[in-house]
Amino acid sequence: MTRTLWDSSLGKKTVMAVSGLIMLLYLVVHMIGNLKIFFGSGEFNHYAHWLRTMGEPFLHYEWALWIVRVVLVAAVVLHAVSAYQLSRRDIRARPAKYVHRKPRASYATRTMRWGGIILGLFIVWHILDLTTGTVHPGGFQSGHPYQNVIDTFSTWYGNTIYIVAMLALGLHVQHGFWSAAQTLGAGSATRDRVLKTIANALAAVLTLGFICVPVAVMTGVVS
Amino acid sequence: MKLTLRVWRQKNADAPGTMSTYEVDGISQDMSFLEMLDTLNEELILAGDDPVAFDHDCREGICGACSLVINGDAHGPERTTTCQLHMRSFEDGDTIDIEPWRASAFPVVKDLVVDRSAFDRIIQAGGYISAPTGTAPEAHAAPVPKPDADFAFEHAECIGCGACVAACPNGSAMLFTSAKINHLNVLPQGAPERETRVLDMVGQMDSEGFGGCTLTGECATACPKGIPLPSISAMNKEWLRATRKVRR
């Protein structure tokens, strides 16, 4: 059955849909966690520490966090590899373009591939910035995420990269959630309107929820 | 009406093609698009030139033979087949671009004619039912619920013209394949091959070199028979069900 899935274009799309939904679920949780920054450094840092102790005493320190990390890396890799292979297939299937061209499909639909690449690059920067601290502006302090977040969003490039990436995320989620639902067979004439509404709502909530953090730092609401 | 036509001319499958410009005059608004091309071809023949090759058959909008991309739209600006498109949809003095279906699975044979036998092979892979031979069975022997009959009929309307593939930026045949699968899979007559049908037809679709679906919705917009976009989701559901049920 694994072979059937991976060898078929529909199977690869299923892999894309499921891995995308896993990442989407994570993003909703991540966004809610981020919003704790509005309740001050104590609550935010306490929440960040809990992420490492979650599951104790059944799980050892940081085990739960590492399980989440492994699942996410697997999802990103599967999503990217199937996207690459499916895109190659799509481009091969339509080698000659029409002379008479018309702009088609929504902006979100047309930017799925480049948007995905932007998000991939953003994830690398985001981890190097706020998880490992490799490219963090100022001194990265492990265990003081509140201060680290403020450092990042006190630079113009930190804000620019983050906000552009979150806009790309919104577009990607808007078309991606709807497409994933169709791929998994949830689409029908009666349900499509609801699915599109959920996709639009998810895209808007995630984008606004993430962007309000740098905006709050820029405007001094969080300092 | 006087029109300027820019038509894709290509001698054969291996020759490079190009857009050639022609002027046609004396076109009536009541002519169909194909009759307008007939007029052009008569002039070309009288002038000793090679007439423009294009597919057509019934000219009643039910056979699926006609296939032109007109000003970037499969079957032109109206939601119908090219043979049912009339010149009243255009203005006097218009320039009209006419191109063949574009997809690597539909190679150009000559001018505007493409080879659509990939669709035939998808049908051969499972677009049939196992029926006993002999006299026709009693029509009421296999009851079909009304919603299922409607669903089957909606998809049975597909005439296999290939406009979905031509309109899709990925050259995907998913709307065609899903119409054929859904039409038979929902009916009791199609039940014996329900799982193998979807697996084999999707497998054939993949091996013909069609692209995948990215839900742009261009296919359903271009379809002259109004096959809806959720057809593809229904096919995906059937395919996922079949992969769980069938061990191979």
Give each language-model segment a name:
Chain B
Residues 1-23:
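Eukaryote-biased recognition of intrinsically disordered, low-complexity regulatory segments
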Residues 40-73:
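A basic, amphipathic helix-loop patch mediating RNA/tRNA/ribosome contacts
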Residues 31-50, 96-248:
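Ferredoxin-type iron-sulfur electron-transfer modules in oxidoreductases and energy-metabolism complexes
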Residues 8-10, 24-27, 57-59, 71:
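Acidic/polar N-terminal loop/beta-strand segments that form early-domain functional surfaces
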Residues 20-32:
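Short, contiguous acidic and Ser/Thr-rich linear segments
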Residues 63-118:
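A generic, well-ordered mixed alpha/beta core segment in the N-terminal half of proteins
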